[in-house]
């Protein structure tokens, strides 16, 4: 059992380092004025408006954001904007969400019968998958926050945990 605890620590560290790398790359892109207005700009404005108690009617789109994507996940993000309104919050949440996907991937690999070292390798494969890096680098998309949730739901279904599924 101790070995499994050590390995989840390894996967946890891999996830933390990956989140920092993902955040660093997307922040650098944003700092160099390479961010686009039609993704990060819209969500930055919408989350800011929600944090101020105003209706999320984007000036870019001209209508209520729920009429565009119905992205309910942006409402809790407004709490972060209460601390300090910055698009970097969105980039950080996205980076952490993507990096957290390594944990359920590791558990799924163990549940599928892979050895612990192979399960760690699968978590690393997830983190090194080019799509994970590219989706992080390209603006902000709230659906990315669902990646670890979907992987967790698959794990719950495979474990027969209907309540979590």
Task: Describe each model-derived feature in a short phrase.
Residues 1-24, 110, 116:
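Start-transfer (signal-anchor) and selected internal transmembrane alpha helices
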Residues 74-78, 83-103, 123:
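Loop-to-helix entry region of an early transmembrane alpha helix in multi-pass inner-membrane enzymes
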Residues 92-113, 133, 152-155:
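Transmembrane-helix motifs of polytopic, lipid-linked glycan transferases
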Residues 135-143:
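Short acidic/glycine- and proline-prone juxtamembrane loop motifs at membrane-interface regions
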Residues 113, 145, 151-165:
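Membrane-interface transmembrane helices that cradle and orient dolichyl/undecaprenyl
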Residues 119-130:
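Short helix- or helix-capping micro-motifs
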Residues 24, 42-65, 72-73:
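Extracytosolic helix-loop segments that constitute the early lumenal/periplasmic catalytic or substrate-binding loops
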Residues 20-41:
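Helix-to-loop transition at the C-terminal end of transmembrane segments
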């Amino acid at each position: 059992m101790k070995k499994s605890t050590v390995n989840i620590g390894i996967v946890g560290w891999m996830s933390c380092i990956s989140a920092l790398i993902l955040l660093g790359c997307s922040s650098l892109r944003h700092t160099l004025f390479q961010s686009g207005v039609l993704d990060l700009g819209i969500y930055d404005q919408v989350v800011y408006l929600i944090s101020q108690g105003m209706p999320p009617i984007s000036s870019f789109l001209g209508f209520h954001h729920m009429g565009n994507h119905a992205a309910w996940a942006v409402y809790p993000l407004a709490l972060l904007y209460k601390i300090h309104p910055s698009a970097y919050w969105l980039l950080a949440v996205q980076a952490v969400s993507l990096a957290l996907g390594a944990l359920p991937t590791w558990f799924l690999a163990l549940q599928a019968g892979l050895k612990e070292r192979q399960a760690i390798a699968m978590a690393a494969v997830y983190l090194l998958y080019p799509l994970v890096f590219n989706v992080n680098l390209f603006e902000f998309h709230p659906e990315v926050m669902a990646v670890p949730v979907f992987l967790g739901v698959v794990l719950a279904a495979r474990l027969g945990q209907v309540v979590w599924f």
